[in-house]
A protein has these predicted regions:
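Conserved alpha/beta-hydrolase "acid-adjacent" motif
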Residues: 263-268
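A catalytic-pocket lid/entrance helix-loop region that shapes and gates access to the active site
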Residues: 44-106, 151-176
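Conserved acidic catalytic loop of the alpha/beta-hydrolase fold
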Residues: 2, 13-27
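Catalytic active-site module of serine/aspartate enzymes centered on a nucleophile-bearing elbow/loop
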Residues: 285-320
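Short beta-strand/loop motif that positions the catalytic acidic residue
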Residues: 250, 255-258
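Active-site loop->helix "elbow" adjoining a glycine-rich segment at hydrolase catalytic centers
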Residues: 34-39, 47, 261
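Alpha/beta-hydrolase fold nucleophile elbow
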Residues: 25-35
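Alpha/beta-hydrolase fold active-site neighborhood
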Residues: 104-251, 294-296, 302
Length: 320
């Protein structure tokens, strides 16, 4: 129980500053992705005088409450699903058909039956509905996985769930021996201690309805306007943060990278975080979650490296 109160962002940024001091660095140079952007922005707010260079890619906007963040992310995943379906439709054998306007309906026809009967797989577990959705979402994190997603949906159309189950296992951190990494559990523990809890069933009901509207490809059509309370509602320790705009007077020039079609941390979150920090915003055009030094884009990588090494700020309005 004591541990649960000390795994959140508040404690981690203190640890980061201790590590900086122990290593003998007068100031911190930091590149953070996804949740790492929350760590970076929180560190900047707490220790602006200790920052040398800060690059935040795939922004978590701390001014958003959990409901707002969830709905923004739902819309992000829907946008990337639409982009995938449009790309897939260029091929006559696309499992979602050649009309992107019908892609959601075709997708629901493929995954809906899994709610009653899992698809067979070489693994004795079979492919459940939840695993299918998880596998699809994993593939939407990067357009490098779209070809594999097409393979998985084509297999499902033929009654086989192997590839989608492999994608779900990738997301969940499942090892070959059947054990799992603790990544998802750790993420739940962190967000539950960081953020305010939603304890009103009416709020979760409205959130569920709005989520279905924002991401129709994830809507099973069974929404009633009611929904169970989420895991964090029963978390046994108080939350340590509330939504707020980041304020970091004295912070040196920093950089935020935001991808136009990022499903998990949508583009606008990066725009908003850059404004709060007074940071230079680099826009990356692509369909993926985070891009700096991982997408293989010379324009973006050069700008980030030049800043981290030489503190050379990117050109205003840089788009890569």
């Amino acid at each position: 129980m004591d541990l649960l109160g000390h795994v959140g962002t508040r404690e981690v940024i203190q640890d980061m500053d201790v590590m900086r001091a122990v290593l003998g660095d007068p100031k911190l140079s930091y590149l953070g992705y996804s949740y790492g952007t929350r760590l970076g922005s929180a560190y900047a707010e707490k220790f602006p005088q200790n920052v040398r260079a800060l690059v935040l890619d795939g922004a978590v906007d701390s001014s958003q409450d959990p409901v707002q963040e969830s709905l923004r992310q739902a819309a992000g995943f829907q946008g990337v699903f639409t982009a995938y379906a449009t790309d897939c439709a260029k091929n006559a054998d696309c499992p979602l058909g050649t009309d992107p306007a019908q892609a959601v309906a075709r997708f629901r026809e493929l995954v809906g039956p899994l709610e009653q009967t899992p698809a067979p797989t070489a693994d004795p577990r079979g492919l459940s509905y939840n695993d299918a959705i998880t596998g699809v979402q994993q593939a939407l994190y990067s357009d490098e996985l779209w070809e594999i997603l097409t393979q998985g949906l084509s297999e499902l159309r033929g009654g086989n769930g192997d590839t989608l189950l492999q994608l779900a296992d990738m997301y969940d951190g499942r090892r070959q021996d059947g054990t799992y990494a603790n990544t998802q559990d750790a993420f739940n523990a962190i967000r539950c201690v960081d953020d305010p809890r939603i304890t009103d069933p009416a709020v979760t009901g409205r959130q569920d309805s709005e989520y279905r509207k924002a991401a129709p490809f994830l809507d099973d059509g069974k929404g009633t306007g009611a929904a169970p309370l989420e895991l964090c509602a029963a978390w046994p320790v108080p939350n340590t943060s509330t939504p707020h705009r980041i304020s970091a007077p004295g912070l040196p020039p920093t950089v935020v990278v935001s991808t136009t079609d990022d499903p998990a941390t949508p583009y606008q979150a990066g725009v908003d975080l850059a404004a709060q920090l007074g940071a230079d915003l680099i826009t990356f055009r692509g369909n993926r979650h985070t891009a700096a030094l991982v997408a293989g884009d010379r324009c973006l990588d050069d700008a980030v490296i030049n800043y981290l090494v030489d503190l050379a700020t990117p050109a205003p309005g840089l788009t890569c």
